[in-house]
Amino acid sequence: MNAPRYAEIGVTTNFSFLEGGSHPQDYVHQASRLGLDAIGIADRNTLAGVVRAYSELDNEELAYKPKLLIGARLCFVDGTPDVLAYPTDRAAYGRLCRLLSAGKLRAGKGECHLTFADLEAFVSSNAARPFPSSWPGLTRPSTSLQPRVLQDVDARDKPGHDGGKREIGRSQILFVLMPPYRFQAKAITAALERLTALNSGNVWLALAPYYRGDDKRRLARLRRIAAAADVPGIATNDVLYHHPSRRALQDVLTCVRDKTTIDKAGRRLEGNAERHLKPAAEMARLFRADLDAVAETLRFADRISFTLDELKYHYPDEPVPPGKTAQQHLEDLTREGIATYFPNGISDRLRATIAKELTLIAKRDYAHYFLTVHDIVRYARSQNILCQGRGSAANSAVCYVLGITCVDPTEIDLLFERFVSEERDEPPDIDVDFEHSRREEVMQYIYRRYGRHRAAIVSTVIHYRPRSAIRDVGKALGLSEDVTAALADTVWGSWGKGLSEMQVRQAGLDPTNPMIGRAVELATELIGFPRHLSQHVGGYVLTQDRLDSYVPIGNAAMADRTFIEWDKDDIDAVKMMKVDVLALGMLTCIRKGFDLIAQHKGVRFQLSDIKSEDDNNVYQMLQRGESIGVFQVESRAQMNMLPRLKPRCFYDLVIEVAIVRPGPIQGDMVHPYLRRRNGQEPVVYPSPSGEAGDKNELQQILGKTLGVPLFQEQAMRIAIEAAHFTPDEANQLRRAMATFRNVGTIGKFESKMIGNLMARGYDATFAKNCFEQIKGFGSYGFPESHAASFAKLVYVSAWMKCEHPDAFCCALLNSQPMGFYAPAQIVGDARANKVEVRPVDVSFSDGQCTLEERCGAYHAVRLGFRQIDGFRWADPDEERVRLEAGLPPSDDWAARIVAARARGPFGSLEQFARITALPKRALILLADADAFRSLGLDRRAALWAVRRLPDDVPLPLFEAASAREQQDEQAAPLPQMPMAEHVVADYQTVRLSLKGHPLEFLRAVFATERVVTCREVSETRRNGRRVRCAGVVLVRQRPGSASGVIFMTIEDETGIANIVVWPSVMEKFRKEVMGARLILVEGKIQASPEGVVHLVAERLVDRSSEMGRLSEGLARPPLPTGADLYEPLTYEPLNGDRRDNPDAPAQRLRHPRDVRILPPSRDFH
């Protein structure tokens, strides 16, 4: 007897969000292990997970590759039962994509509203008709593009692939009707009749057991219905997870989806763990009374020939003028660019490089891609939007002369093969950064230029991470909010593998408690599951054909944004082009700084005007580590590296950007490079044995980095030149280095590379360190070209900070949020550099921060209304986009004040309120921010005066009488507001204070505990000195290359101090490290010869509760006696100390309002 065979057609993956209990890859492997003929991925109204299953079929670990059926489970809003839809070929697949797009584009983000009428429209012969010109919005009209523009663009019918518009013929979508567990025979019969009338010969009725004790009777009813309708029945297990062990997790997902708990979910949960992939023998046993239903699965699978290999991508042709080919136009633009960038001519070497690149571009047929990116950059520059390309594209001389990148090929050793390679059959990838405040203009240009049916943003899969997994599992299991919050608060950053027993104990919980243990176990299992789709940060897919015939398109949450269901890895797998239109805050800052310099100093600068070798003052500033606000070098690690590296030229900045990265650090390349740079170690170049090759083969590769590999390009060249990798092996190595997801695959190259290097006589330590560096690049490393692109912005931002600190401070504040530091630190740094900063004031401030008349060497910075938390103001760039789109202006309170002030100065608060007509909430916010000083009112007096005003919208007849009554009322004398309360109020309203720092009012408190200032810590040179220091936590950083070490920056009234927290200390004081706003640190001083000082923490105490003293009136501490001044510092218990009982809960704040006194730290990982 032949062994039974079976194809499972009803697989639900975890891309049916909060329903499926397994990844698509899990199903592929399980189907391979079970020997199934085929598996059909059919997620709920989506194709989001199919590429992952498709890509997994290439996994070498698969002993057997089942056939993959690409489909979707269509769920309707009009009561039609669910239908599995499987296209038989490329044309049918295109119609399915467009059907799903239609449902998604009429619904909100993450939803799909389908009706049976939609099914009729896309299965019948009318499916050949394109969408009408109103397609981009359907029932959700665009809010930023004029309708006439949309119609003109979107009505075009581009030539190319049929995109699913071919006449039906044998191109079919196969339908399987899926009856629910409880069904009415009439409803199923009616649905079958409608489906067969629509798609005769291509309809099945699913026969799925649910293992609830009535399967025999229920399946018999369904067979009778199928026979009466003359459609075949087909077996399926209606699979929810690949293995029974995932049943509990699937129950949790059900509870999360339905917002209930395990105890209350009842029949919404499966009563068993049977809905998993089953082997053919088991399905044959279950359907022994109807084996033909099992055999039907094979006939069904045989009907389907479509695979994702059939998706053939075509570049858009808009950038190509009539009468030219794309390659001809690219070469013409290249010649024009050479004349622009090199007016005195180019060297023979550069000419040969450009010719080589153009030849390879022609061979790979990539000219359209380069022209498309050039077109987008050209538009941005025509609108005075700063932009520059980066990444591997900066290896291209053609990109430079086209104006896409800024890396001069005469300054940097380019490796074009890292960008485009003859051996590599994959599209190039050019990342272009635009001003973050004006990027939307560029994005809407792309929609107008290519049409919304041919352009959309790539998706990003939002995965469960430790915090979200713990919170959702805790809710599903019925844990109280305080328990789940306590567990979640022990997690650092976004990613992680779960919770340790120590973390559970530090949350004040018992890890041996069965419920807590189960919650931790399920949360760990849930980490990495997709939660929902979101739009990518800026990756666009552009096509010559209809994009909605490749992949479904849906609405983003943001108006006028649409995105596809596939992420960047998916489109790489199917070889579709992506253009990255990214946002970079520093470009906004630089442009706004240039505008301020032009407005107030009469000099107009462009990026190209700032020459990186012109100003030695800039390099001297960086050598001192004064880089707050400077692009890429403002982290504590970079600020500590600057005095050690002592950059003196542009290429030093390239190295500075790249050296504080996992690659060089893990490869132990940093210290050898610094020793050689500082003359403490001779510069030597690794070499092979004499008989194995040229002893100087690495000198050309490593010459600029003193014999130490620091960049990805160098690692690749070492693999090729020294380890003798073939071009294909080198390409595989490049791919393994390229992204986070491939960190686990890079190890397979280890033995080959190290073995080849040692076999050729290279030192074993060098060989191992080289590969450790490559593994570091797999986490996060910079290629030389990318570092060079960023180094240009490092220099420009450092130049502005050095030469125009007033404009730099103002531009930084107007570009928030961005960077490492909050406005308080930006303002503090500017004031330390002799820039006067003036408070928000109704008589002088605008919506944005502005520059006022000179005060000494620099202009004064006036804080704008944007600094007031909750105050309405409109960004000028965003407002311009709104007005150009024909939308009404924003409700801009700041603009009202500026307009009223233009008619004359304000004489009183009452007059101000009357002529600005601001709502009372706006007046209260201004008074809270102490913005009425120019009217003779401090914060308390202004708040009192505002509260005396009538409520909003007074009746005209009584307005004058009300005004007279206010004039007659005598002002009550108010006690003076203590300065400490003013500082607290400043931080609560404008997030900074020009009046003082909170710590100066607590200095007497800390002095009794022998706490030194941050300045004393930073200026000490005594290694090993034990000190206590307290400060506001500004930044917490846990770099991936630091092996779990956390770097904290704290601030008091004297400056900042750098704190190092080792992993063992972090585990002991996790709550304090992660949660404290005001922290006391005890430890030892660690001072380097270059003057970099750290306080290495041994104990930490959360002293955030002390902030309550500022708002409640300062409690006077006992006066010190002076008897302990010469005693050795010992570790007596401090307020809130948990040294002897680390599992005890940390001290809590006295009142919830105290949490809001200080802004939260900016945390990075």
Curated annotation (Swiss-Prot):
Key word DNA repair present: yes
Catalytic activity of the protein: DNA(n) + a 2'-deoxyribonucleoside 5'-triphosphate = DNA(n+1) + diphosphate
Annotated InterPro entries: DNA_pol3_alpha_NTPase_dom, DNA_pol3_finger, DnaE2, DnaE2/DnaE/PolC, DNAPol_HHH, NA-bd_OB-fold, NA-bd_OB_tRNA, PHP_dom
GO terms, biological process: DNA repair; DNA replication
Transmembrane regions listed in the UniProt entry: none
Locations listed in the record: Cytoplasm
Pfam family, one: HHH_6
Protein function: DNA polymerase involved in damage-induced mutagenesis and translesion synthesis (TLS). It is not the major replicative DNA polymerase.
Any one cellular-component term (Gene Ontology): cytoplasm
Annotated region described as Disordered, given as residue ranges: 1111-1165
Superkingdom classification of source: Bacteria
Keywords: Cytoplasm, DNA damage, DNA repair, DNA replication, DNA-directed DNA polymerase, Nucleotidyltransferase, Transferase
Entry protein name: Error-prone DNA polymerase
GO molecular function ontology, one term from the record: 3'-5' exonuclease activity
EC number: 2.7.7.7
Database matches in Gene3D superfamilies: Metal-dependent hydrolases (3.20.20.140), Nucleic acid-binding proteins (2.40.50.140)
Biased composition (Basic and acidic residues): 1152-1165
Enzyme class: transferase
NCBIfam families: polc, PRK05672.1
Membership in a protein family: Belongs to the DNA polymerase type-C family. DnaE2 subfamily.
